[in-house]
Amino acid sequence: RLETQGIRDEEFIRGKAPMTKEEVRTVSLSKLRLTADSVCYDVGAGTGSLSVEMALRAHQGQVWAIEKKEDAVELIHRNKLKFAADNLEIVEGLAPEALTELPVPTHAFIGGSSGNLKEIVKLLIEKNPQVRIVINCITLETVSEALETAKEFGFEENEIVQLGAARSKAIGRYHMMMGENPIYIITLQKK
């Protein structure tokens, strides 16, 4: 059972699908505040790195990875097997339609919305008005859309964290810090 977040990026099987980096995963998981029996969605799951860590944290619950790209779905299957994330279910499809038949979520992570953020959030709160949602945004337009959506649906407990991580890279006998793309982590939950 996973006691802390932060599986190293190198441990995941990767392809061309985007992967939430370790530092961002760790903060995003912290903001989700999962419990052992959480029922979680990972929308736009990519490689499944966050899905796997969610499943290991919510080991008595359920995690649903939703991904539209076939090659990424295959990576999620491979990472599920590698990390023995038996409570991780994988749904190939586009949200929000792919979410309609899933069980009621207690938590949802949105890493990719394909332009359907408002519709996804609407469906999540229809299923559970108290769902805790964490959204990762790489563009200012998505941040704006997330905040407009939060206001429209009456979320009072909103938090935005901007994370800019850098990693060292060896340059001969020296080390240089190489910045990762900055990311906005938005947490939504109704009181």
Regions found by a protein language model. Give the residues of each.
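Conserved S-adenosyl-L-methionine
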Residues: G44, L56-Q62, K127-P129
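S-adenosyl-L-methionine
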Residues: I66-P105
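C-terminal substrate-binding/active-site "lid" region of AdoMet-derived donor-dependent transferases
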Residues: L123-G179
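Class I SAM-dependent transferase core
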Residues: R1-A36, Y41, L75-R78, K82, ...
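Conserved SAM-binding loop of SAM-dependent methyltransferases across substrates and taxa
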Residues: T47-H59
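Short SAM/SAH-binding signature in class I
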Residues: V104-G112, E119, R132
